[in-house]
């Protein structure tokens, strides 16, 4: 069971929890739901009835969290229409920039030290022979230790790079809006989730004892 001792107070106070922290809440709710299903076993019910009376599994909250956050801890595209649209635009812009860079690799092959698209300061650059740097319009981001290579971001892709940075900033804002919404939902149920965790610990211990008793042939 995940440790929610940090996440729940943050959400209860109106703060924003991270995607992985919110996923841990969903995992805990799922564990409670599965355990509740096990309790339907008639042989276990007498022992667990008193404990389970206060168990709320919050299935709607679990479903909402699972819908918005992928198993990897990434906010899902479907979490909000703006986020999904922004990611489509980002993917399209990256593909367009990649195509242009590959075209430039072919066009300026004679000027390059190698045919690899490198990265400097988060921007794509071509490794240009220092003596030929003036023949490739663009922004110089770096040079090799020997000075024989200059890393240039071609002018042809700079506007796309700027557009990508803008879109990525908007993507982060859209992700934050989703996390804020989900954190608010968790915050509203923080007392119930805390109680649920305590009940889970009791049930887990009780079920373990029951299974052990059955294994050794104990008779109650």
Label the model's feature ranges.
Residues 93, 171-206:
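Intracellular alpha-helical coupling/juxtamembrane segments of multi-pass membrane proteins
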Residues 108-124, 186, 190, 197, ...:
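Glycine/charge-rich, flexible interdomain linkers and switch-proximal surface loops
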Residues 40, 101, 105-108, 112, ...:
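Coiled-coil heptad-register positions
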Residues 83-132:
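Extended, Lys/Arg-enriched charged tracts that mediate electrostatic binding to polyanionic substrates
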Residues 1-86, 189-192, 196-210, 217:
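Conserved amphipathic alpha-helical "coupling/scaffold" segments
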Residues 115-116, 120-154, 161:
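SMC-family hinge/dimerization module
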Residues 59-70, 159-180:
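Extended, charged coiled-coil "arm/hinge" scaffolds of SMC/Rad50-like chromosome-maintenance ATPases
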């Amino acid at each position: 069971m995940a440790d929610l001792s940090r996440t729940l107070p943050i959400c209860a106070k109106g703060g924003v929890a991270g995607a992985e922290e919110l996923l841990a809440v969903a995992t805990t709710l799922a564990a409670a739901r599965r355990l509740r299903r096990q309790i339907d076993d008639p042989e276990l019910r007498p022992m667990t009835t008193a404990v389970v009376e206060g168990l709320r599994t919050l299935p709607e909250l679990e479903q909402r969290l699972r819908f918005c956050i992928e198993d990897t801890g990434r906010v899902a595209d479907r979490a909000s229409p703006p986020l999904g649209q922004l990611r489509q635009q980002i993917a399209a812009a990256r593909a367009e920039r990649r195509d242009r860079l590959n075209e430039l690799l072919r066009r300026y092959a004679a000027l390059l030290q190698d045919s690899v698209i490198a990265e400097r300061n988060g921007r794509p650059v071509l490794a240009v022979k220092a003596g030929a740097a003036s023949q490739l319009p663009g922004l110089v981001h770096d040079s090799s230790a020997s000075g024989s290579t200059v890393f240039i971001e071609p002018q042809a892709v700079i506007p796309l790079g700027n557009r990508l940075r803008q879109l990525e900033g908007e993507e982060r804002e859209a992700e934050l809006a989703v996390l804020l919404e989900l954190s608010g939902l968790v915050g509203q149920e923080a007392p119930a989730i805390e109680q649920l965790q305590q009940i889970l610990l009791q049930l887990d211990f009780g079920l373990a004892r029951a299974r052990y008793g059955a294994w050794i042939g104990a008779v109650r």
